[in-house]
Amino acid sequence: MPHEMEENGAEVSDVMSENEDDTETFLKDDEKMTEQSTTDSTTEVKKKYDPKDPLRPRRKKARRACFACQRAHLTCGDERPCQRCIKRGLADACQDGVRKKAKYLHDAPPEALRPVLGPNYNPTPTPSRTNGHRHSSSQSDNLSATGSNFFSQGSTASLPVYSAGAQTPVAIDGLPSFNPQTSPTSFQGPINNAAHTPMNNMMPAGNMDFNALFDPSNPALYNFDLEGLNFGSQYAGWEFGILNKMALGAETPPRENSMSQTPTTEANYAALFGNANNGFDHPMLGADFSGMDQNNQSLYAQGNLQHGLPHAYAIAAGPTSLASPSTDTTASPHSVAGMDGSPNHNFAGIPTVPAATRPRPKHNKAGPKSILGKRQRDSAAIYESVKEPYPYTTGFHNMVAVLRNRLPGNKLLRIAKALGEIRPSFISCTKDLTRQDLVFMEKCFQRTLVEYDDFLQHCCAPTIVCRRSGEVAAVNKEFTALTGWTKDVLLGKEPNLNVNVYSGRSTNGTNTPDHNSQGEMTTPRPQRAMLDLSGGRPQPVFLGELLDDDSVVEFYQDFSQLAFEDSRGKVQRSCRLNKYRAPQDPDQKEPGSQKDAQPGILSSRVTRIDGSHGISRIEKDGKVECTYCWTIKRDVFDIPMMIIINFLPRYLPDQGPQQLAV
């Protein structure tokens, strides 16, 4: 036994134990205990270590010393009763000592400052004793004598309710039953205070004391095991639990009234104890609380201060509402107990202060929207809606038909040569894929497109997302402002009436149109019979229709290099984008003349920028000089899935910054 005390003993948890006199006292006391408890015939000489020797074995620190060891400034252990009290015959009176509170913890209730119960904690209940010489503040011995039912220790001690006067232990024998016909946060208290029925639907099985319900360090409040986390400090475990609760609460899509829909298997303490507007009603308190507030002293009254509710919350003692702490004058309108308009319950004798009423927003029938402004999306809807694979073969045929009707023969031959290099690789990658694989490939594309929609909303550069066949799948507003191509036209939801294209079969070898040929004509579209093969889905605009001739050739030459050879590469080049020009109705007036006729509120410079998106100065011959950078996103089969392209407009070669409107 002495060797176990020397090896497994704990260091003194008080500051006074570091002195040399205390160490000598401990050595003398240890020698006396050794003489009294030694019964073996074989005596071993115990090696004594110099207290000043830095190489002496260090003792293990105790979490908290008992009251007897704390008074004697001796080493104590984590177990209760400790070994020293057992040897001294003080096992029945061994309990945790009371430490002096720090100033910033003066308002914290004692049960919130309870130490974390370690694995060596002995849950044996010991009778609490009263000490007349101890001060009658919130530091009471019987608080830490036994663990509450929340920590599964089996103890049923009645903890006191603290007021400005003496300590008066009050226990709850029963609480009114919960009416399942009403809302989850509404309660009906009995008329007769003497008759009580157990609260089976609200509380878990087992006896429960009053202060334990108010205990903010209770792990059941946030459904995590504080003891099992094995934190050295309760505050670290409490912080970890709150962060864990926040992480588990971040769901997509958000559930409506998720805070008020508490499972019936857990204790709904948040509905029991609300803010200043949602406390107890007097009939609900029962006969045990009838004389508690005779002098208009609230539950948390300290000294001469009278509090309806605490004005601030100390560490590990937070408000019962998950919203910000509320005071008497500013009550939170989002308290958990009052989310669905439940009736207000108040303590007897405590005046209520009306909270600032705010208009409650109307909920959309489509579903609740997130408070943080995130767009609600459901991945399950994407997986259920995609039933057929995407016809990429038809898409490539339509792309070739568009390029064949537009480009001259020499440039079309260069594009065909570039596509011929990657065609065998596409065939070898897709020949072993089944129909289910192709459907899954399309689901991956649609799910990835949802993520890129958020990216497009926050990207300030003009950006488009295309399939590997060149069909536009997503676009942001900046690209529309730069080129004039609207989103509905690019995605095929509206007809493409662009007249800013020309047939290149009889061109003079440059990017300028040959006026001796057909001249301006609408964008050549594939035949209707070919479009019907796609199942009647809208035909988006191809990337080849947005770029000029030379830029299209350069793009597909770069695409042949990045498709399979350089999987992580990117391309940065100069290009020219075709502006969208719809045929104007002769009866329709010029938009500029209408704007000039109206009295403008903005200045002339801002009006010019707003009228032409600030792009008219960098446009030449219906084209916009740009620098673009693009990369390839691959699917789970390592096949090019989508192409993400960013554009930035740039100056013309003979243009200065002063000539720009932006």
Swiss-Prot record:
One of its GO terms (cellular component) is nucleus. CDD domains: GAL4 (cd00067). GO terms for biological process: cellular response to starvation; gluconeogenesis. Transcription factor which regulates nonfermentable carbon utilization. Activator of gluconeogenetic genes. The keyword Transferase does not apply. Residues 1-61, 105-149, 502-524, 580-606 are annotated as: Disordered. The lineage of its organism: Eukaryota, Fungi, Dikarya, Ascomycota, Pezizomycotina. InterPro entries: ERT1_acuK_gluconeogen_tf, PAS_13, Zn2-C6_fun-type_DNA-bd_sf, Zn2Cys6_DnaBD. Residues 25-34, 43-56, 582-593 have a biased composition (Basic and acidic residues). Belongs to the ERT1/acuK family. GO terms for molecular function: DNA-binding transcription factor activity, RNA polymerase II-specific; RNA polymerase II transcription regulatory region sequence-specific DNA binding; zinc ion binding. It is found in: Nucleus. Keywords: Activator, DNA-binding, Gluconeogenesis, Metal-binding, Nucleus, Transcription, Transcription regulation, Zinc. Residues 66-94 bind DNA. Residues 448-519 form the PAS domain. Residues 121-130, 137-149 have a biased composition (Polar residues). SMART domains: GAL4. This is Transcription activator of gluconeogenesis NECHADRAFT_59099.
